[in-house]
Each structure stands twice: as C-alpha cells, then as structure tokens.
C-alpha cells in the first residue's frame, strides 16, 4: 500500500527524514530501527570539514524555528569511511546531500559519494540560505542551477535530485531549467529566509543575522510550490516543509509529491517519522485511497479518483 518507486529508489514507504534534521542517523537509532524508513537523507557533505556558523545558530519562532547552522559536517572522507559504512547495517537506501562553494566542489563530492554501496541517489543542495558562498546562489539562477546539475550528472553513478529554494520569484522556471539539464527528480522546499530580533539588545538573535525558517509556518508555501511545479515537470518530487503528521504527508502527495521528507518535526519528536509511517495507511483509507500512487497529484489531476468514488 505504501510502496513508491522513484529513480534509484525503491521505497517501502514514502516517508524520509530530511537532510539536516537527522544527522547521519546515529542519535535516532537509539529510539527506533532505521530500517523502517523509506530512505534517509543524510546531512549535507562538503569536500572539506565545515565547522558551520558562529553561535547562536538556532532560534524558535511561533510556528517553527530559524536555523543558521552553515552546513556543519565532518567532510567527504569522514562520511565515506565512517558515516556511510555505519549506515550499511540498515535496510534503507541513502540519499546523500551534496554541497559546495563552487561547481568543482560539488562534482568532486558527487563523484566519490555516489560510488558508496548504500547511496542510491544524490540530493544537490543548491538552496542553503546560510552560507556565504555557493549554496543559494546556485538555486536562484536558472542557468547556474542547470550548469551545476549537468556537471554532477556527468560524474554521478546514481540518480540526481536537486533541492529547490523557495526564495525565488519563479520556482517553476528554476525547476524546468534543472529538468532540462537532466535531473532525475526534485526535492522541495528548502527553508525560507527569516530573522528574529532580541528585544533587550535590539539586535538579531542569530549570529548570522538571518536564518532558514522551517516547521509548520512554511507548509502552505511548500504545498503551493509543489502544486505548481508538479504540473509543469515530468520528474518526481520529494515534498517537504512543515510535515508533522500523516495528514500533512497526504496533503503533499495530493499536491503532486511522490514522497515526503520530515524535517523540523524530528527535533520536537524523535519518533515523528515512524509514527507517520504507522498512521499513514489508516489516513489513506479514511480518505478513500488504496495506494500512494492514487494520491499523487490528485489535487490537480482530477482523473485520479479515490477508490470509493470509482464505479
């Protein structure tokens, strides 16, 4: 009922912890067997280790959080020799998130990490708003996004998904350029740029001043963008942005996503992903669906009728 087939990914269910909200899975493995997950999007990997931005790097908001971590990670060598081998014990495909400051950085990381036996797909992080070079610069320019996608596709041994930024005037234009460049899929959305101020000092709470807004506050934006982009491209979308419940996951599927990533909710409830997986079948049945496939794009593809509406 929950199985989903995507380029490079045979998912037992469509629920995936989002990159940056799950580390490399070690902390969460103390709570449950990671083999229950559809896939795991590991933390962004760069060529060299990164220590990230100065603190404070996280601030709560009324319906979510701001983060300005700055792609902190142990670097490519450590991920290849320590993190990925540790994850081999789980029966779950890995989606490796690749980041960098320039095209050559992405290409080098992608070429090596795509050869790891348990990496089934790459996620190009072209939309991180919290780093001074690379990151979001690639995600806001169609030509740059396309050139980067082409370069990585040439060296990758596995399908390439590209993570889209919501901080653009026309996200569909970016998506179409990336599809034209050969991407196998899209993941969307990354965080919205936001800020909070300390009332005592009058200054920004985050040392980076701005940060990425995530959590329930961004879900309506994410749903709208998935809805728009999914009607224009012919490659699958992994939707994300404020998913906390099985009902949220279904909403993304109806908007046009083929799978759903869970981010900030993991910080609030470490059992968020397995709970959504457990509850999703009953939620699908409640609304008349017998499979994930029936739901995908139902909001705009009205030929897809729920089972209980069929003759």
From Swiss-Prot:
Its main location: cytoplasm. Catalyzes the conversion of dihydroorotate to orotate with NAD(+) as electron acceptor. It is an enzyme of class 1 (oxidoreductase). Keywords: Cytoplasm, Flavoprotein, FMN, NAD, Oxidoreductase, Pyrimidine biosynthesis. The keyword Flavoprotein applies. It is found in: Cytoplasm. The keyword Ribonucleoprotein does not apply. It comes from Bacillus subtilis (strain 168). It catalyses: (S)-dihydroorotate + NAD(+) = orotate + NADH + H(+). FMN binds at residues 19, 43-44, 97, 125, 163, 189, 215, 241-242, 263-264. CDD domains: DHOD_1B_like. It comes from the Bacteria. This is Dihydroorotate dehydrogenase B (NAD(+)), catalytic subunit. The active site is at 128 (nucleophile). The lineage of its organism: Bacteria, Bacillati, Bacillota, Bacilli, Bacillales. One of its GO terms (biological process) is 'de novo' UMP biosynthetic process.
């Amino acid at each position: 009922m929950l199985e989903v087939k995507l380029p490079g990914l045979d998912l037992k269910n469509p629920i995936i912890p989002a990159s940056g909200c799950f580390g490399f899975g070690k902390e969460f493995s103390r709570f449950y067997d990671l083999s229950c997950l559809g896939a795991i999007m590991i933390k962004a990997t760069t060529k060299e280790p990164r220590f990230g931005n100065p603190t404070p790097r996280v601030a709560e908001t009324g319906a979510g959080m701001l983060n300005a971590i700055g792609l902190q990670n142990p670097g490519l060598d450590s991920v290849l020799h320590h993190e990925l081998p540790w994850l081999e014990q789980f029966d779950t495909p890995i989606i490796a998130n690749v980041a960098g400051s320039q095209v050559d950085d992405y290409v080098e990381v992608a070429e090596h990490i795509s050869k790891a036996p348990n990496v089934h797909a790459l996620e190009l992080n072209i939309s991180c708003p919290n780093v001074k070079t690379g990151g979001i610069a690639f995600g806001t320019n169609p030509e740059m996004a396309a050139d980067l996608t082409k370069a990585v596709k040439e060296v990758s041994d596995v399908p390439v998904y590209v993570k889209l930024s919501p901080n653009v005037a026309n996200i569909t234009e970016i998506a179409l350029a990336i599809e034209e460049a050969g991407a196998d899929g899209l993941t969307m959305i990354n965080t919205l740029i936001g800020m909070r101020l300390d009332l005592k000092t009058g200054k920004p709470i985050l040392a980076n001043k701005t940060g990425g807004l995530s959590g329930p506050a961004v879900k309506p934006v994410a749903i709208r963008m998935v809805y728009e982009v999914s009607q224009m491209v012919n490659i699958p979308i992994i939707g994300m942005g404020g998913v906390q419940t099985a009902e949220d996951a279904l909403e993304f599927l109806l908007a046009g996503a083929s799978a759903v990533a869970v981010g900030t909710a993991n910080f609030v409830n470490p059992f968020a992903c397995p709970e959504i997986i457990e509850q999703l079948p009953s939620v699908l049945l409640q609304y008349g669906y017998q499979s994930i496939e029936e739901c995908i794009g139902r909001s705009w593809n009205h030929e897809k009728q729920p089972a209980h509406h069929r003759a």
